């Protein structure tokens, strides 16, 4: 375990029910991250998506990848001081090449793997993939920016 949920909460501003990363298991600064979220039937989203046959929304899979990418960007830029930058936030800039291949359902361990494609200053372009049982379930190219919260 690299970062548990308490450490992740020190880095990201997201909170329940929108914190979509439970743990970071691998991180190489300015290169890559692996993290996961355990999907349970208790997720609020399953009350409406879909009650008879619950499917975790693809948009939340992408958001989880983006949050993992936010941890990677913060740790890459600020190192061990990543949790001491409350004045900064990561914003999504774009999502490209998104594909959803297999539905994610309750009981799945959703693993996010992201690699840095390009990084310049506070701008990050990441290749993200999500897996369940080592099977690719979704992928996307994400662009994000670390910015001041007040701007």
UniProtKB/Swiss-Prot annotation:
Pfam families associated with the record: FabA (PF07977)
Task: Please indicate which superkingdom the organism of origin belongs to.
Answer: Bacteria
One GO molecular function term of this record is: (3R)-hydroxyacyl-[acyl-carrier-protein] dehydratase activity
Q: Which SUPFAM superfamilies match?
A: Thioesterase/thiol ester dehydrase-isomerase
| UniProt keyword annotation of Lipid metabolism present | yes
Cytoplasm: present as a keyword of the record?
Answer: yes
Q: Name one GO biological process term.
A: lipid A biosynthetic process
Alphabetically sorted, this entry's keywords are:
Cytoplasm, Lipid A biosynthesis, Lipid biosynthesis, Lipid metabolism, Lyase
Query: Which InterPro entries does this UniProt record tie to the protein?
Result: FabA_FabZ, FabZ, HotDog_dom_sf
What main location does UniProt list?
cytoplasm
Write out the annotated subcellular location.
Cytoplasm
Q: Which reaction does it catalyse?
A: a (3R)-hydroxyacyl-[ACP] = a (2E)-enoyl-[ACP] + H2O
Q: How is this protein annotated for GO cellular component?
A: cytoplasm; membrane
Gene3D superfamilies in the record: Hotdog Thioesterase
Give the range the annotation lists for the signal sequence.
none
- Its EC number is 4.2.1.59
Q: What class of enzyme is it?
A: lyase
Q: What does this protein do?
A: Involved in unsaturated fatty acids biosynthesis. Catalyzes the dehydration of short chain beta-hydroxyacyl-ACPs and long chain saturated and unsaturated beta-hydroxyacyl-ACPs.
Q: Which family does it belong to?
A: Belongs to the thioester dehydratase family. FabZ subfamily.
- Name the record gives this protein: 3-hydroxyacyl-[acyl-carrier-protein] dehydratase FabZ
GN (gene name): fabZ
